[in-house]
């Protein structure tokens, strides 16, 4: 299963594609289950105070993995089209996490369609283009003037009394 010496190149590529397709379907199912457990708060009877704690402590997920999956699951419960897009490989977990906070009833179909089959970076650009943040105004601030009496060099001697 983990040794590929006797596997032809074309066969290896086909196996990889099939595994990725299965992984996409499993990820969509996993998100659906996480979302339902989260909604029912079934982590509480398991001795966990949050879905995040349950994922990390009971399911042995990394913190990053737990965070991404929970947020994606919550977005997918609100907008079930996400499950379909993840299952067919049109949208990845990172993309769901970028899009999730931006989705609403009015824009979710259009945004999900535009994000389909795009990289995380391209989805970030899509989000930025649709909801640009105002530029941070340039600020100039006056720095406090150095005080000869307060300026301490080596040995705590004020600059005016120090020898060069």
Give, region by region, the residue ranges found by the protein language model.
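Short helix-coil boundary/hinge micro-motifs
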Residues: 1-164
């Amino acid at each position: 299963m983990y040794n590929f010496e006797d596997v032809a190149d074309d066969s290896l590529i086909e196996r990889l594609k099939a595994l990725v397709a299965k992984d996409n379907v499993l990820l969509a199912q996993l998100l659906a289950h996480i979302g339902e457990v989260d909604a029912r708060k079934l982590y509480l009877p398991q001795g966990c105070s949050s879905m995040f704690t349950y994922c990390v402590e009971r399911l042995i997920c990394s913190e990053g993995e737990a965070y991404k999956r929970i947020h994606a699951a919550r977005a997918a419960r609100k907008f079930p089209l996400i499950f379909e897009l993840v299952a067919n490989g049109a949208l990845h977990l990172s993309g769901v996490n970028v899009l999730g906070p931006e989705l609403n009833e009015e824009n979710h179909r259009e945004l999900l369609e535009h994000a389909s089959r795009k990289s995380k970076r391209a989805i970030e650009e899509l989000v930025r283009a649709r909801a640009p943040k105002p530029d941070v105004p340039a600020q100039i601030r006056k720095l406090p003037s150095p005080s000869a009496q307060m300026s301490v060099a080596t040995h705590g001697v004020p600059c005016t009394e120090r020898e060069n």
